[in-house]
Amino acid sequence: MQVSVETTQGLGRRVTITIAADSIENAVKSELVNVAKKVRIDGFRKGKVPMNVVAQRYGASVRQDVLGDLMSRHFVDAIIKEKINPAGAPNYVPGEYKLGEDFTYAVEFEVYPEVELQGLDAIEVEKPVVEVTDADVDTMLETLRKQQATWKDKDGAVDAEDRVTIDFTGSVDGEEFEGGKASDFVLAMGQGRMIPGFEDGIKGHKAGEEFTIDVTFPEEYHAENLKGKAAKFVINLKKVEERELPELTEEFIKRFGVEDGSVAGLRAEVRKNMERELKGAVRNRVKSQAIEGLVKANEIDVPAALIDSEIDVLRRQAAQRFGGNEKQALELPRELFEEQAKRRVVVGLLLGEVIRTNELKADEERVKGLIEEMASAYEDPSEVVEFYSKNKELMDNMRNVALEEQAVEAVLAKAKVSEKATSFNELMNQQA
């Protein structure tokens, strides 16, 4: 076997391989012998068919199969010999084959980039220092009450957190526009569902009033014909409702799994959940900064084959989220996913190099801790832990999570890490 390797462009490689004629003939003869043992041909007993008859009938197809097999095996031998690490599926380019002559073919592919980590000591990471305060728990309890609130009619003017039922008709330059009219439209105030100025124009009015408000569509509005346009909306305010918050009764508290139904028990449960969320948020905030610094400090070429593969993964994930199938996934434009796919490949390659250079392996105690932390959010944590322990794929996924955490910690060990006091709400809003 003769092998030559050339760089085509960037990470592209072209390996040219020549297989000796006698190697081909020996492989063909060997395969024909195997075929002769199995085939049935009229007039001959099984296994007793003359080789010339077998060769005449099956020679062409056997030779084609043998060439395909030899091309694959010799390519594997070549990349092992040349210490080449292909990224993605190779493209075989067969040369012209002539009976009794050496056969030359080429294989085109990309290789993984050579990554030499640098600039880790210049990465700056700001670690949030946060604790869940009594005031944070109070705010969360108020949120829970609002989520369970009922609505009652209100005689007074509309306030910031009321709910209104309205008819409205919008116009630009005196002309009504598509999508600018609705009847019995229910709007919960303060959620930012409408364009700027719409809710403000309703506040202070009472049920039964009809009035006109002036607003301006944002420049980034989705409808091209309305971007930046001044508009008028005629509003018929039909109903105003205000929240009626439930009291923290034993019955209400037990809805949240607090068996004793006490306020103290609910506060303890809420605090525990908030602290679990907080731990994850701090971890994610630190991790994102470390990875961002790692990417900025290390520009690398990325194999197109790996980006294509990652785009396919993202397409399928997107289709699954919206109930689509494989065919619909492939129809999604690659441009939607290209930037994210490239980013994921770059991060994977860099963290892979961190893992390699630090000789990291998944810490089983960490894996166990991650599973227990995740399971604590469920009603029966022990059942979730047992389910994971019996599922190899889930365990492997969690080992990958642990290994990634260990790689990030290796980066942080060399980075400049400072601490910054912040509040629970500020940190959680950054995560949103």
From Swiss-Prot:
One of its GO terms (molecular function) is ribosome binding. InterPro entries: PPIase_dom_sf, PPIase_FKBP_dom, Trig_fac, Trigger_fac_C, Trigger_fac_C_sf, Trigger_fac_ribosome-bd_bac, Trigger_fac_ribosome-bd_sf, Trigger_fact/SurA_dom_sf. GO terms for cellular component: cytoplasm. Residues 161-246 form the PPIase FKBP-type domain. Its EC number is 5.2.1.8. It is found in: Cytoplasm. It is an enzyme of class 5 (isomerase). It comes from the Bacteria. Consists of 3 domains; the N-terminus binds the ribosome, the middle domain has PPIase activity, while the C-terminus has intrinsic chaperone activity on its own. Involved in protein export. Acts as a chaperone by maintaining the newly synthesized protein in an open conformation. Functions as a peptidyl-prolyl cis-trans isomerase. PANTHER family: TRIGGER FACTOR CHAPERONE AND PEPTIDYL-PROLYL CIS/TRANS ISOMERASE, TRIGGER FACTOR-LIKE PROTEIN TIG, CHLOROPLASTIC. This is Trigger factor.
